[in-house]
């Protein structure tokens, strides 16, 4: 069966063999899929738990590894490791979009490569590992998979300001009229997602999304940068 083969393939990539494979299935299920399949569980609750497991694991690591770094600096470095863009990079390395269950409509609109969907799914997978194997296994998994990201954060090598990079490139080409416009938001107040259009050359070049307006703007800039590369 194709779904079973894909699950085994992802388990191999993660280096985790699940006792309860349904946890992984739920972690890989987007809400759009559940909307079309009413008995399917989707991954939002796992995202919530995975975020907490990730935050604690990274916090504990930084606290023990760097006893002379101030609380404020530790907070900044942790934020770099756990931000949506970093999570998306991890998910891309796993080719996570290939395994996510989503509606046909979501897939047609680019859901398999959408930053927020991939990032949320990474958190859900972490939660699935935590529930299946316990905290120590989940923590060791995080420290292994995020090793490069952690090191880059410590060495201040993570650059997340896509807006500035895009502005520099466009200004070098004589384009200065760059606008970010909030077009809508959706979801409950505690989990509100924002959508922002990026405009230049009198045209909408990309639409970004994120759980803050700033993240949505950065996502839009990141997508526009990829478009410039193509």
From Swiss-Prot:
Residues annotated as domain DRBM: 161-230
BP-aspect Gene Ontology terms: mRNA processing; regulation of gene expression; rRNA processing; tRNA processing
RNase III domain ranges (all copies): 7-134
Catalytic residues identified in the record: 51, 123
Protein's cellular compartments: Cytoplasm
GO molecular function: double-stranded RNA binding; metal ion binding; ribonuclease III activity; rRNA binding
Alphabetical UniProt keywords: Cytoplasm, Endonuclease, Hydrolase, Magnesium, Metal-binding, mRNA processing, Nuclease, RNA-binding, rRNA processing, rRNA-binding, tRNA processing
Residues binding Mg(2+): 47, 120, 123
Primary enzyme class: hydrolase
Function: Digests double-stranded RNA. Involved in the processing of primary rRNA transcript to yield the immediate precursors to the large and small rRNAs (23S and 16S). Processes some mRNAs, and tRNAs when they are encoded in the rRNA operon. Processes pre-crRNA and tracrRNA of type II CRISPR loci if present in the organism.
Quaternary context: Homodimer.
Name by which UniProt lists this protein: Ribonuclease 3
Organism, scientific name: Clostridium acetobutylicum (strain ATCC 824 / DSM 792 / JCM 1419 / IAM 19013 / LMG 5710 / NBRC 13948 / NRRL B-527 / VKM B-1787 / 2291 / W)
Highest classification ranks of the organism: Bacteria, Bacillati, Bacillota, Clostridia, Eubacteriales
Gene symbol of the encoding locus: rnc
